[in-house]
Curated annotation (Swiss-Prot):
It is found in: Plastid, Chloroplast thylakoid. Keywords: Chloroplast, Plastid, Thylakoid. Its main location: plastid. GO terms for cellular component: chloroplast thylakoid. It comes from the Eukaryota. This is Unknown protein from spot 112 of 2D-PAGE of thylakoid. On the 2D-gel the determined pI of this protein is: 6.0, its MW is: 22.9 kDa.
Protein backbone atom coordinates (compact mmCIF):
# COMPACT_ATOMS: atom_id res chain seq x y z
CA UNK A 1 0.00 0.00 0.00
CA UNK A 2 2.39 2.64 -1.21
CA UNK A 3 1.10 6.07 -2.23
CA UNK A 4 1.14 6.40 -6.00
CA UNK A 5 1.38 2.67 -6.64
CA UNK A 6 -1.25 0.44 -8.19
CA UNK A 7 -1.77 -0.84 -4.64
CA UNK A 8 -3.14 2.55 -3.62
CA UNK A 9 -6.63 1.03 -3.87
CA UNK A 10 -5.91 -0.45 -0.43
CA UNK A 11 -5.36 3.03 0.99
CA UNK A 12 -8.32 4.67 -0.73
CA UNK A 13 -10.64 1.73 -0.28
CA UNK A 14 -11.62 2.00 -3.95
Amino acid sequence: ATKGSSDNRVLTGV
